[in-house]
Amino acid sequence: MSEIIQDLSLEDVLGDRFGRYSKYIIQERALPDVRDGLKPVQRRILYAMYSSGNTHDKNFRKSAKTVGDVIGQYHPHGDSSVYEAMVRLSQDWKLRHVLIEMHGNNGSIDNDPPAAMRYTEAKLSLLAEELLRDINKETVSFIPNYDDTTLEPMVLPSRFPNLLVNGSTGISAGYATDIPPHNLAEVIQATLKYIDNPDITVNQLMKYIKGPDFPTGGIIQGIDGIKKAYESGKGRIIVRSKVEEETLRNGRKQLIITEIPYEVNKSSLVKRIDELRADKKVDGIVEVRDETDRTGLRIAIELKKDVNSESIKNYLYKNSDLQISYNFNMVAISDGRPKLMGIRQIIDSYLNHQIEVVANRTKFELDNAEKRMHIVEGLIKALSILDKVIELIRSSKNKRDAKENLIEVFEFTEEQAEAIVMLQLYRLTNTDIVALEGEHKELEALIKQLRHILDNHDALLNVIKEELNEIKKKFKSERLSLIEAEIEEIKIDKEVMVPSEEVILSMTRHGYIKRTSIRSFNASGVEDIGLKDGDSLLKHQEVNTQDTVLVFTNKGRYLFIPVHKLADIRWKELGQHVSQIVPIEEDEVVINVFNEKDFNTDAFYVFATQNGMIKKSTVPLFKTTRFNKPLIATKVKENDDLISVMRFEKDQLITVITNKGMSLTYNTSELSDTGLRAAGVKSINLKAEDFVVMTEGVSENDTILMATQRGSLKRISFKILQVAKRAQRGITLLKELKKNPHRIVAAHVVTGEHSQYTLYSKSNEEHGLINDIHKSEQYTNGSFIVDTDDFGEVIDMYIS
């Protein structure tokens, strides 16, 4: 035998071979045929069981025997893959109508493996036989099997639209399919309407076929997604569990799950919900129990007293497989090629298949009826000359001679002569001619009817409709999945995710933040806070773990930090720098921090810059879901800094003080609400080389404490301030000196909460009591507190 060697490039060989392989797994493994809704291995399993007589009316047989038949005759692959496919056809949580009945352990909705095939037994279900009905009447084409020892069907007759009824899922080279199961009665009704009106629209079809009907039930949301899928083959719906609420004897409530989304692993779902409880991702769940038994699926989620059960349910919908999205991808083999198909195309392909099946069956039955009628006519003729026929047969040498004599003498056809000689003489003499004439009459009517079906397309369609109606009547069942038109927005109360706890929030001037338990705070006291050298406390207050912290910086940005995300650190220990939580720039400085309990408020923030710009923005604008980077609070122009952020519940007076001692007081009602990216308007009309050092809210009982670079402190009462309009120059608060004039480096509004001040130079600090500073008149420079020759020039002042 001579060898043939081809010189081919590796690129060409790989491309060609992979192309062949891809075509094979697309057509012969992973995708269903649109006509019978089956993949090749499924079709071979059902045909092997049918041809071996393993039908619904017989006893169960070992699954191993069927697997052996399939891999021996039709499917030369591993026995495990065949058995897995066989088991899936028997699982009522995978298929809307099972095609195989199985005795023994056939797996579970917990994804437990089935028992080995040597232990389980199986047979075809009654409905599966409707897929195979009339297969012996030349209804479909057969092809040689893999070793040419027998024949196998290319497709099954499929007397109901199995692709839509049981759906399909699979992945192949470059293609995937996800077709959901549907209600058999609805699918057949839609098919009947399509037969009556081939121009029927998807909207009209959806009056009959409402949407998917999953074997596990559940609630389907999103009519628009269903319609899109039925039109184009692709669409998205939401499938959520059926959850009911029960009240226990102790007054607690529990959520009872009785239906879960399609293809969701129950045990994994229970484990996930329990992990959320154990990890304290959700607050309010006491216990999760799987109470599933022979009566049906049941998962119990016991809740704490007085907890919002609706919010917990919504949290679980969002964070577990209690709710999933299902994506239609209706790809099937049509005319030998994978196609993305809408529901009209699927029904049309199925109907064309049924037209072919019924036509082939009718031709087969017509041929048999005509053959039988020919035989009956011969028998009637023979009975009319019975004595002569008997005499001729007796005088013949053998059966062959008798047959030839009948043809020659009485002009019987070969088929008629064969039928006569095959009858024993006693049967021939006892044959009732009346019965034969009756059969002849029936055959005449049958042939007429069959010819009418073949000659009249409407008659053929009526046969299909009648048979579909019979299947619908015999196998119809109630819809399992409830369909809701709209996809419900999931709203989760913060209380569900975060346990409510009162804690102490602290922020230092150098940007160290922490939350501390009230117990730790009370055990230490304010003075014992953990600080770095040169740092001091900017603010501390009692907040709730369900609150949100807004941290504002000199760059006009803010950090949105849920309190529960802050590390729980003891009061005596150093906190986290905000840059470890949300990255900020090296020269970015924290200027204020606020906590918000509810962003749905009429309160507002006021922002003031060093160069005299100001703006007002309402609190709801600051709510966000982005925690990982700083967000814009206000636009700060180049060579400017944000120096003050205030929060007010309603309009009130604010006072602006500048470095050169100018002061302007006006009402925030003069400011319009603006967006976060706005720069604002002019707050005060600044002199040349002057800048703002303070903008704060003020009231009649307050005083203002100012520090100058020369170590002087000046305290004035509210009555010195003159309420004016925004953007004016204001009044003078310092006595102007020609030599070494005082310049205000810091100023603060003093309320009843404040008792101490701290002065800072580059290397020193000085503490004192605010009440020791007497109130001054307008045109004074205050009292010297420190000697700058020893202390250094004052650069800042804080009050507490």
From Swiss-Prot:
| InterPro entries (alphabetical) | GyrA/parC_rep, Gyrase/topoIV_suA_C, Topo_IIA-like_dom_sf, Topo_IIA_A/C_ab, Topo_IIA_A_a_sf, Topo_IIA_dom_A, TopoIV_A_Gpos, Type_II_DNA_Topoisomerases
GO biological process terms, semicolon-separated: chromosome segregation; DNA topological change
Q: Which domain of life is it from?
A: Bacteria
Q: Does the keyword Cell membrane apply?
A: yes
What is the protein's name according to its record? DNA topoisomerase 4 subunit A
Q: According to its UniProt entry, what is the function of this protein?
A: Topoisomerase IV is essential for chromosome segregation. It relaxes supercoiled DNA. Performs the decatenation events required during the replication of a circular DNA molecule.
Identify the catalytic residues: 119
Protein family: Belongs to the type II topoisomerase GyrA/ParC subunit family. ParC type 2 subfamily.
